[in-house]
Amino acid sequence: MDNRPIGFMDSGVGGLTVVKTAQKLLPNEEIIFIGDEARMPYGPRPTAEVVEFSRQMASFLMTKNIKALVIACNTATNAALAVLQAELPIPVIGVILPGAIAANRQTKNQKIGVIATLGTIKSEAYPKALAEINTKLRAYPVACQEFVEIAEKNELHTTAAQKVMNEKLAEFRQDQIDTLILGCTHFPLLEEGIQAAVGPDVTLVDPGVETVHQLIEILTKQALQHAEGPKAQDQYYSTGNIKNFEEIARTFLNQDLRVEEVKID
């Protein structure tokens, strides 16, 4: 048993979608989350910059004595997963490979759409991961940077947001995909609108769910589970825009939580 907390990090509020799954499947675990609101979005930034920001976020979480780290951000996973795995003395997992594994399990026609930030799409991280798992899979990637802004502004259910989603995802109709990877942790916040845009016959895959299952496996194999019984309260930190972050977090997680501001540079 190991009662230390688990660290989660993201460029903004999107990582809360992974946290929500973790709180459901790992109710005994203490979670410490940090969102880099001051410097988001990560998607358009150079890889070297994302690596540096990821190091800084991980360093902050390490001061909280975490026992494992989840990079709850696709852009940061692509840029910094291998770096942080090499540099940190604890298990570090990302969201890309778990997402590809889940999509391969779901698809029936081997046609898989991928929506993500510009950085993740340009890196071809998901097509590469899918090809490693199953060479018969065909990936159809589309950059949807605008979706991040919709989520961060908490405009999830507006008519304007649905119009943007309909326009960006229209091409998937002719591609005849049957599975769509939500390749940015912000995107499950827009799940309802995305499903409406692509139609009911397309299965949406949230990589965060598979990521938490992998986390459970690691905690079990390495005897890192938290003991049953009372645990410390989960902690939430943001590098900027506390009010907006807190509002989204409280609504999405359905908790009366408090977010603390932290300066990282």
Swiss-Prot record:
Gene that encodes the chain: murI
A Pfam family per the record: Asp_Glu_race
Reported function: Provides the (R)-glutamate required for cell wall biosynthesis.
Pathway annotation from the record: Cell wall biogenesis; peptidoglycan biosynthesis
Keyword Nucleotidyltransferase attached: no
Entry keywords, A to Z: Cell shape, Cell wall biogenesis/degradation, Isomerase, Peptidoglycan synthesis
Keyword flag Isomerase: yes
Entry similarity comment: Belongs to the aspartate/glutamate racemases family.
GO MF entry, a single one: glutamate racemase activity
EC number(s) reported in the record: 5.1.1.3
Enzyme class, first EC level, given as a word: isomerase
Active-site residue list: 73, 184
Source species of the chain: Pediococcus pentosaceus (strain ATCC 25745 / CCUG 21536 / LMG 10740 / 183-1w)
PANTHER family per record: GLUTAMATE RACEMASE
Signal peptide: none
Name assigned to this protein: Glutamate racemase
Catalysed reaction, written as an equation: L-glutamate = D-glutamate
Residues at which substrate binds: 10-11, 42-43, 74-75, 185-186
One GO term of the biological process aspect: peptidoglycan biosynthetic process
